[in-house]
Amino acid sequence: MATNSGGDSKNTLYCSFCGKSQHEVRKLIAGPTVFICDECVELCMDIIREETKSSSLKSSDGVPTPRDICDVLDDYVIGQSTAKRVLSVAVHNHYKRLNHAQKAGSDIELAKSNILLIGPTGCGKTLLAQTLARILDVPFTMADATTLTEAGYVGEDVENIILKLLQASEYNVERAQRGIVYIDEVDKITRKSENPSITRDVSGEGVQQALLKLMEGTVASVPPQGGRKHPQQEFLQVDTTNILFICGGAFAGLDKIIAQRGKGSAMGFGADVRASDERGVGELFTELEPEDLLKFGLIPEFVGRLPVLATLEDLDEDALVTILTKPKNALVKQYQRLFELEDTELDFTDDALKAIAKRAIERKTGARGLRSIMEDILLDTMFDLPSMDNVTKVVVNEEAVTSDAQPLLIYADAEKGSASAG
């Protein structure tokens, strides 16, 4: 086994798979006629792990177990264990319900349980849905509620959601009727005032009304090419009874409604009298009641068709540091790859990672704000680096995050000097 150490270039060994030399990797493992580096071994392990998970995802009756679904979600989404469990059970029951419906002679009809995901911005709602799309064996589509309008007005009809599901199933109607739909930004279609309005609200309450029958179960007429319906056009008939709907939204301001309701009931010596700003948004969301959603602007019929409620928490400092470093597509790994293309190593100190997480918490943008902070820190370095020679390493320390100081640049000459001095 060769380790990363200096030596004669004539005796330099190279990985037979990626071509990197023994000086560019931590370990180089030798076979009879070939060599493999530690990075290629890790890549092979990831490939085998994915294959094993996909083959063992289903239990004996063909239904993925909630624990299996949750384990796969854990690989990509940090934290949010409660929301993962709710989603895993809901998807598992969706599969079981479909299998139960196919069995003849059953007197009990299992109703579906659509899901509402509520959490502050950047906490992982959309990522959970995208990860589900990768691991499920049913057609899956995501729709943006902000683009929807009532039928007859400029914008997308709600039937376009089903069209996207049909496209995901390659126009196989039977498969589409067993699919899952995720509607994002559902908090943006709330009615504009708490009282019913005389004027039509075509992008708010009107969309909620249009989604009601679709979510409950109806036969939707879908134009195969999309667009508006024309009398001459043939429609595809899609039964939405067995389609699972997951709705998600940040619901900005809902925490204030919950806190206001809590103030009215806080009396006596044992009452919790902490100010609402002392409690996180995620903590307040755990006390959510249907009446809060009605006050926010959802109509009662819409809330009634979303019986399963999962609230996501604010991400704390440890979770944000983990998001920066651990997932397969972690931000730190992405920027390290960018710097590798300039033949430069990028390193972050532990204190720097914690400082980045603190800045994201102060901005209240969750994990979504991490990239803008990283761009801000590395902007000048990325601007100057392509024009500089002999820079082998860039180190981001705490000062580079908390002040105007630049990341430390280590030059090849300095490394040689320290090596000879040693």
Swiss-Prot record:
A single cellular component GO annotation: HslUV protease complex
Annotated Zn(2+) binding sites: 15, 18, 37, 40
Gene Ontology biological process terms from the UniProt entry: cell division; proteolysis involved in protein catabolic process
InterPro entries the UniProt entry points to: AAA+_ATPase, ATP-dep_Clp_protease_ClpX, ATPase_AAA_core, Clp_ATPase_C, Clp_protease_ATP-bd_su_ClpX, ClpX_bact, P-loop_NTPase, Znf_CppX_C4
Gene3D superfamilies given in the database record: 1.10.8.60, ClpX chaperone, C4-type zinc finger domain, P-loop containing nucleotide triphosphate hydrolases
Residue span(s) of domain ClpX-type ZB: 3-56
Keywords of the record: ATP-binding, Chaperone, Metal-binding, Nucleotide-binding, Zinc
GO molecular function: ATP binding; ATP hydrolysis activity; ATP-dependent protein folding chaperone; protein dimerization activity; unfolded protein binding; zinc ion binding
Entry binding sites for ATP: 120-127
Protein's job: ATP-dependent specificity component of the Clp protease. It directs the protease to specific substrates. Can perform chaperone functions in the absence of ClpP.
Family from the record: Belongs to the ClpX chaperone family.
Assembly and binders: Component of the ClpX-ClpP complex. Forms a hexameric ring that, in the presence of ATP, binds to fourteen ClpP subunits assembled into a disk-like structure with a central cavity, resembling the structure of eukaryotic proteasomes.
Protein name according to UniProt: ATP-dependent Clp protease ATP-binding subunit ClpX
Organism field: Ruegeria pomeroyi (strain ATCC 700808 / DSM 15171 / DSS-3) (Silicibacter pomeroyi)
Lineage, opening ranks: Bacteria, Pseudomonadati, Pseudomonadota, Alphaproteobacteria, Rhodobacterales
